[in-house]
């Protein structure tokens, strides 16, 4: 027993299974016609996302129809009060041992910080690395302070595990700790004070789930979650860099990029570039990671000449540079042997768990318009006019554009324009800036209409009601137009992603954690990089068609200053095919990413592969198993690309998730990609829908800011095409296809904008 006088803190050991059941489900296989009843008395028919099963289990869930007529699965119902089994400790933990581990971890971390200060290496202004880092975190934006406690905890966890000689598997199940109040404030995400009846979402996403212990779920600053346990090589934070079969180093991410992803022009037969661009815009609404920094300075992992990596004491503990072969077909021309790569910032754990690293998401996990409005009060306020509920904008040519940035740090020095929005990546590429401009205009259009309908509403009411409507518009388009286009209508129905138009629902579950998966952020939702074209074909109505290489419009949205460019570019995005999703990626991304006026840039494919290893995502085969597919045991099973894979991977079990997912043949029901990515993406957005109390269709039993039946019927009329037509500078004479993501064709002909009627805002009169 501990002496009664020892009051520093109390350590309560509770070994828990690796993932809470609200976070994990397993893949299922479905027959085409689900039955309406479950045969077992211990099962009930629920939506798939509501069913809790073990992540490592190979379970086949029987399909059925829910009481609402939706496709569900027969799921075992746990008996009330039944507790999950807890494994006993194979050792006894003394307070002294734990204190020693904390002390040793603190000493190691302190030495690391002192070493960093002594060997401080920062990026040089204008270098490719600086531009690449702007891709992850442009300076000067209120993203929230990085928490050094999260990194110290990694060294504490390693010290603790080493002292107990724990295996890697045991380290993934490190105990939860109940600490004294002072340590809890230091190591845990703070609880939020919530009003369960608040009509509007919080800007930072907190209190969506008003249960005190869950009030941070999905909020900005909450970590990414996982479908499967991480593959950290030390069970704590060491990235996945060795073969799980041979133990030898995995091939360089750049070598894999060169071998597997050439630049081949294969245009998609159905979808246009607007699908690609809307996907990136929406991804910024629910994912925002940033690399580790030294205070406000960037971390450099390569030497000044990029001829090699920094070594020994000169290397930051978060460095993970990408090696470049001396025989590289492109970088060898410039003597480049090292691409800078810094690991992602970590978050504190909401449960004070002393365990493996969890990556930080700086924006809300919800689809809530945070890319338009921001994820914190300071940023949101800076974007408002505080008059009539409108957002700030600029009119340099008489046409409404985003407000200009206060500094040019996030753009090329020679850019004539640099904008700001709710997300600081707004200037990454001009087509992304176009999407931000569209939804800025939509906000101000709706706010102006509401002000005319409800003259008694003040600025705050107009702003919040408009934000609520625009968030609903984004959800409606995302779930009913975008997701069916990428995962297929069958998969969208299977996971309950499609909405019942004009009807209130009550699907919210406080037990579904609305958190973005590492697997989505680090791999699956990066599928769109394969669909990027190397150039925009901009069809101007009043001048000659223009072919613009994408590297000319990275961090340079100046073309928006041209009169009528906004309208012309939207027409062009709807008309130009996206690239086919396959084993090809444009050199604009794999050689010239953010090159500026340099002859070379970085390689996004390499960054994606390295990011997956930083996240410690498990190999592709593990996710095939999770999705109900057979593991691939030979490279021949990958098809024609198998020989190229075999040239850079030792074993099929080594193939990275992003690589394998891109190469998987599309499903038969119209998805862009194969079953693995389709399952991950569908599972993800089912969680974000059914775990969102404020989802736009949820009625008064669930959502204190619910829409009336009349308002939902108007929202059901909204389409991306109608939003585009409502916000053009010259809608007369402009035609758009009703399905804005599909190329114009005889089955999807362009129709005059006057026929694309959206919602009638008079449904909001007096409400």
Curated annotation (Swiss-Prot):
The modification N-acetylcysteine is found at residue 188. It catalyses: 2 a phenolic donor + H2O2 = 2 a phenolic radical donor + 2 H2O. The modification 3',4'-dihydroxyphenylalanine is found at residue 331. InterPro entries: Haem_peroxidase_animal, Haem_peroxidase_sf, Haem_peroxidase_sf_animal. Its cofactor is heme b. SUPFAM superfamilies: Heme-dependent peroxidases. Binds 1 heme b (iron(II)-protoporphyrin IX) group per heterodimer. Residues 28-187 form a propeptide. Heterodimer. CDD domains: peroxinectin_like. Glycans are attached at residues 165, 237, 457, 658, 764. This is Chorion peroxidase. It is found in: Secreted. Keywords: Acetylation, Cleavage on pair of basic residues, Disulfide bond, Glycoprotein, Heme, Hydrogen peroxide, Hydroxylation, Iron, Metal-binding, Oxidoreductase, Peroxidase, Secreted, Signal. N-glycosylated on Trp by mannose.
